[in-house]
Amino acid sequence: VDHLAPDLAADLTKVTAWMSRQGLGEGPIDDIREITGGTQNIMIRFGQDGPDGRRDLVLRRGPRHLRPISNTVILRETRVLRALADTDVPHAPLVAVCEDTSVLGDAVFYLMEPVEGFNAGAGLPALHASDPAVRHEMGLSMADAAARLGAVDHVAVGLADFGKPEGFLERQVPRWLSELDSYSKFDNYPGPDIGGVDAVATWLRHHQPASFSPGIMHGDYHAANVMFSPTGPDVVAIVDWEMSTIGDPLQDLGWMLATWYSPGREPVLPNELMTVGGLATPDELIERYARNSNRDLSQIDWYAVLACFKLGIILEGSQARAAAGKAPREIGDILHISAVRLFDRAQSIMAGSVTGGER
């Protein structure tokens, strides 16, 4: 553990002692490395040679400076992973959970099996970078995985109380307009310099689907929140379940469409996969989802616009925090550009839903 930061090394020592007490493994650990990603949550991969052979594990806990909800979010993730154990949804298998904060002093944590794959948000291996046919299938595999998640009976897998689906769609516009308004509390933030906020909100209210079938939602379903096979296009795991809940699973498909490559437009999120070409079109993604789902996709444009609206407001929060000195200015500026592009895309989809143009 020498190459880890001292606090993480101390955490790992406590975790391995806990594993021994729980009968989860004995002996020294090796091949230790921190896994970095788009989240502040801490993940450390390590291996252990025990009496039953070699085992590799991943430790996941909240960030160094825990927020009030950090432990709750981590434990919610474990509920989802446990619920998915006997489904065909690609995910990292859960091994063990520690809800006792005294083990680490402040944080709950869990152990999962590692997934052999790569995150497209961190770059593409040679195979995927060089073969457009592989990249084309990557998006279709993402649509497959989203459809499988949306098809899970959340009540049957123990998640009946995991969210509040009643009134879920009605809550979205006021919830996120309220979030945008809350940014005014940040010093030196002049307000959102984003076109179309009111127009998009009004359109969403007027075109809201009349009903939906509740299910498990990932909540942040884009190409950097899945792991792809290193040897092909398949999604081997959906990761980062921090925003998961019970709601309308079609929001995950909408989120994917909102953040996907669009011909002639700048990428919404910085991601190499979105810039190299050869990707499936939005219509192909919808068609593949439909092949694996019984859900009504006739209003999928609404879900894509909602995703643009919601994600745009979330990203603008970094601009507001940057204005107050609570986030790096360069990050705030980059994410503000993404927010503007998302609202531009929302208005293009709104026009296209009437004229048959761009999604």
Functional labels for PLM-detected ranges:
Residues V1-G25:
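Juxta-kinase regulatory segment immediately upstream of eukaryotic protein kinase catalytic domains
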Residues V239-S244:
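Activation of the activation-loop gatekeeper triad in protein kinase-fold domains
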Residues I32-I216, P230-G232:
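ATP-binding pocket architecture of kinase catalytic cores
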Residues K164, R295-A307:
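All-alpha amphipathic helical-bundle segments outside canonical DNA-binding/catalytic cores
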Residues V226-F228:
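Hydrophobic residue at the +6 position relative to the catalytic HRD Asp in the kinase catalytic loop
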Residues Q251-S293, A307-K326:
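Active-site activation/catalytic loop segments of kinase-like enzymes and analogous catalytic loops
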Residues I216-H218, A223:
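Catalytic-loop of the protein kinase fold
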